[in-house]
A protein has these predicted regions:
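Short, low-complexity, polar/charged sequence segments that are solvent-exposed and flexible
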Residues: 17-21, 91-94, 218-223
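Conserved nucleotide-binding/hydrolysis micro-motifs of P-loop NTPases
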Residues: 3-8, 27-29, 77-80, 145-149, ...
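Glycine- and charge-rich intrinsically disordered segments
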Residues: 229-239
Length: 239
């Protein structure tokens, strides 16, 4: 739960469900000028995911009894990407002593920011997630978006809202669902009347019928109770 969204949702909507466990991946510094210990945060993420993978393997044994691991949601995958970038600077290339230290420019140019290292770190999480999928566990990644065409400042024409890390994901992600909010305003007063939250299947390798389809998941209107419709495809097997 990198961005805290998982624990917030669990607290707000599933307070009585003790089967939803939220894990904070961040490791704080005990006495330093930076808040986070990036190397130990990377290690903690790996320990959490490897624990989940071990549980998934154990529950597939014929004599297993008790609760089963249904799925794993990783919130703020873009923040995991930032952990990998900082570790590339601090640990792998020794360009900075912590997450806020400026790198020596000559050294940085010499190494050209070795993005292959960052990519390798990032895909440690990907590898464990793929292992969980093979064990029958559902994996969901939630991420913030950036307006980009992956030229990284060279030419941002025709930019779209995309995950920063998607270009380096090697097509490991089979489905991409983009969430949007569409607002309706009063023509005379300009006040907000209604908000419609939608989910668009921008990518769906496992079900061609869903490709490009859009669903309304939540509707809020001023003075009326919110109407939650959800996204049935997430749990009915059609993905």
């Amino acid at each position: 739960d990198f961005d805290g969204g998982g624990s917030a949702s669990a607290s707000a909507f599933y307070a009585d469900n003790d089967r939803i466990q939220c894990w904070d991946p961040w490791v704080m510094q005990s006495s330093d000028r930076t808040a986070y210990d990036y190397p130990e945060t990377h290690n903690r993420v790996m320990k959490i995911m490897q624990f989940a993978l071990q549980r998934a393997k154990e529950q597939n044994a014929h004599d297993h009894e008790g609760p089963r691991l249904w799925g794993v949601l990783v919130t703020g995958v873009d923040l995991w990407d930032s952990v990998c970038v900082n570790n590339m600077r601090i640990v792998d290339l020794n360009l900075a002593k912590d997450g806020i230290d400026s790198a020596d420019w000559n050294v940085k140019v010499g190494h050209q920011w070795d993005w292959a290292i960052r990519k390798t770190r990032f895909h440690q999480l990907t590898a464990v997630c793929k292992g969980l999928v093979k064990q029958g566990v559902r994996i969901f990644w939630e991420t913030h978006l950036r307006l980009t065409n992956y030229s990284f400042g060279k030419n941002e024409e025709a930019a779209k809202w995309r995950p920063d890390w998607e270009k380096a994901s090697n097509n490991f992600v089979f489905q991409i669902i983009t969430m949007n909010r569409e607002d309706t305003y009063d023509d005379e007063t300009g006040k907000l009347l209604k908000s419609e939250y939608t989910a668009t299947f921008d990518k769906c390798k496992t079900n061609a019928q869903l490709q490009g389809q859009k669903r309304t998941v939540l509707v809020t209107e001023v003075g009326k109770p919110a109407v939650f419709l959800g996204l049935p495809e997430l749990y009915d097997g059609s993905l």
